């Protein structure tokens, strides 16, 4: 059993993996990013890659779960190690007995921006990508993901209304049941699924309905950006007039300062107006982020603030 303090200290955890010869690791993508950084620091301390390889890990499989994977964050891993360790991305939810799909990743996946590849179904499950009328959507078209099969739970304990809303009759299989995930997905031409985020992550700002993932995908293209998250924050929070360029990991909680390039909307008397805030890790310049957003996104999708973090704030179990 790994001591709690070790699990929360990436350098100590990586040292343990090497010392014990661990071959299979299951982590959240955020925790794995911290582990990658610890490995890079260890290699630098060793002096060169050849010496570092003597104390390298023996991982054969790394399995991701618990949160959405941004494939581009694995580019440095593939650059250092190639494909000798099989990386696997899994998608799942509690209501379907956790695991639903798996995707054996390749180095080329790290070159893709935006969507997270979640692969193909576990054999005893059925997957459907449906539109608002619960009709199958064509390949490449975004829809909501529904899951059927042996893993679907009976429902929520003592919550009959929510059970009726989320667990529905399967219109394609007599006597079957489906779970309405609330997740957006689309089929790729190679038969694999892509995860596109939550349908409730669409926010409405100044009358426009916005998909936050589209903004993140554009900002991720900027050189020097390692990871990026865009949130809709209440304008009623404290606002200043200068650009925020750096913050500590706990900055996701307090309100950041705004950019002078895009003014925050004024809160209404009945409900606070939302504004977009981009948080990122890496060494990208805020001006480059603003320019990318202004060039490729409509004005209502341009974040009003940009906050650089040294590292993502993680929960005790490694989630963002």
Where are these regions (language model features)?
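AMP-dependent adenylate-forming
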Residues: 86-89, 103-254, 261, 267-320
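Adenylate-forming
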Residues: 1-117, 124-126, 131-136, 161-162, ...
């Amino acid at each position: 059993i790994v001591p709690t303090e070790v699990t929360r200290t990436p350098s100590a955890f990586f040292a343990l993996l090497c010392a014990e010869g661990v071959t299979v690791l299951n982590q959240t993508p955020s925790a794995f990013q911290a582990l990658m950084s610890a490995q890079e620091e260890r290699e630098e301390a060793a002096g060169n890659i050849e010496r570092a390889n003597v104390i390298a890990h023996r991982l054969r499989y790394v399995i991701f779960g618990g949160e959405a994977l941004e494939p581009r964050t694995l580019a440095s891993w593939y650059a250092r190690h190639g494909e000798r360790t099989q990386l696997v991305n899994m998608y799942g939810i509690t209501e379907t007995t956790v695991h639903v799909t798996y995707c054996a990743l390749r180095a080329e996946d790290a070159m893709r921006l935006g969507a997270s590849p979640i692969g193909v179904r576990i054999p005893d499950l059925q997957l459907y990508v449906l539109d608002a009328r619960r009709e199958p959507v064509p390949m490449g078209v975004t829809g909501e993901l529904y899951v059927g099969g042996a893993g679907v739970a009976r429902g929520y304990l003592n919550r009959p209304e929510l059970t009726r809303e989320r667990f529905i009759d399967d219109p394609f299989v007599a006597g079957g049941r489906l779970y309405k995930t609330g997740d957006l997905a689309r089929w790729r031409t190679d038969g694999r699924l892509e995860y596109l985020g939550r349908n409730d992550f669409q926010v409405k700002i100044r009358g426009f309905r916005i998909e936050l993932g589209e903004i993140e995908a554009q900002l991720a293209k900027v050189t020097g950006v390692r990871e990026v998250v865009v949130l809709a924050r209440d304008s009623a929070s404290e606002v200043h007039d200068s650009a925020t360029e750096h913050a500590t990991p706990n900055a996701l909680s307090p309100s950041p300062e705004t950019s002078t390039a895009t003014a925050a909307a004024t809160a209404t008397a009945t409900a606070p107006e939302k504004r977009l805030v981009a948080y990122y890790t890496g060494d990208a310049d805020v001006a480059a982020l603003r320019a990318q957003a202004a060039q490729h996104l409509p004005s209502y999708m341009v974040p009003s603030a940009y906050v650089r973090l040294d590292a993502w704030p993680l929960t005790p179990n490694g989630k963002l």
